[in-house]
Amino acid sequence: MAASPKINRREHILQCLATMLETSPGQRITTAKLAAEVGVSEAALYRHFPSKARMFEGLIEFIEESLLSRINLIMDEEKDTMKRCQQLLQLLLVFAERNPGISRVLNGDALLGENERLRSRISQLFSKIETHLKQILREKSLREGKGFELDEAVLANLLLAVAEGRIAQFVRSEFKLKPTKHFNEQWNFIQQQLLQS
């Protein structure tokens, strides 16, 4: 008889938390509800995480590792400015779409009433993403000798705001309005405007 695979309880707790964020939009997740979902006592939850804030930090670490590692790949592998920007924004939107519960963390919706350091950490993540966009846009002028009419920081902020807006719509629609819907058409329009400047 084969041994059953050992469940990584910590990962299982985080998966259940993400699922609950997806299936209970607008509702606060309590440790009692989470323990019931996981099938353990609240005390068992606290053996793996000292607080609910640490559980959310576990999700944020997953978000950071997933997004930033892929952004670094885009930066290394793609050299075309417009393709880099498109791929970075598309990565963010696809990640949110594939992880609806986690998109509530990205959006900040799931962090209302939680520890301030969680919202601060998500804010820092978006600052890092915006910095990558600024770098991409600045490298265009270095590589091609011609930049944009608008300051790269202003453009990076605009591009990130588009992605954040799409994620906000996704959360607000209770995951019905996909963030990638019409992205290619929208990107083509944005790209044309950027290249004309």
Swiss-Prot record:
User: For this protein, what is any one GO molecular function term?
Assistant: sequence-specific DNA binding
Keywords for this protein = Cell cycle, Cell division, Coiled coil, Cytoplasm, DNA-binding
Tell me how this protein assembles: Homodimer. Interacts with FtsZ.
Q: Does the record's keyword annotation contain Transmembrane?
A: no
The name under which this protein is listed is: Nucleoid occlusion factor SlmA
Enumerate the subcellular locations listed in this protein's record, separating them with semicolons: Cytoplasm, Nucleoid
Q: Which domain of life is it from?
A: Bacteria
GO cellular component entries: bacterial nucleoid; cytoplasm
What NCBIfam families does this protein map onto?
PRK09480.1
Q: Which Pfam families does the UniProt record give?
A: SlmA-like_C (PF22276), TetR_N (PF00440)
Q: Which organism does this sequence originate in? A: Shewanella pealeana (strain ATCC 700345 / ANG-SQ1)
Q: Report which residue ranges the record marks as coiled coil.
A: 109-136
Q: Where is the signal peptide?
A: none
Pinpoint the HTH tetR-type domain residues: 7-67
Q: Which InterPro entries match?
A: Homeodomain-like_sf (IPR009057), HTH-type_Tx_Regulator (IPR050624), HTH_TetR (IPR001647), NO_SlmA (IPR023769), SlmA-like_C (IPR054580), Tet_transcr_reg_TetR-rel_C_sf (IPR036271)
Q: What does this protein do?
A: Required for nucleoid occlusion (NO) phenomenon, which prevents Z-ring formation and cell division over the nucleoid. Acts as a DNA-associated cell division inhibitor that binds simultaneously chromosomal DNA and FtsZ, and disrupts the assembly of FtsZ polymers. SlmA-DNA-binding sequences (SBS) are dispersed on non-Ter regions of the chromosome, preventing FtsZ polymerization at these regions.
One biological-process term from Gene Ontology? negative regulation of division septum assembly
Q: Does the keyword DNA-binding apply?
A: yes
Family, per entry? Belongs to the nucleoid occlusion factor SlmA family.
Identify the DNA-binding region of this protein by residue numbers. 30-49
PROSITE patterns, sorted: HTH_TETR_2
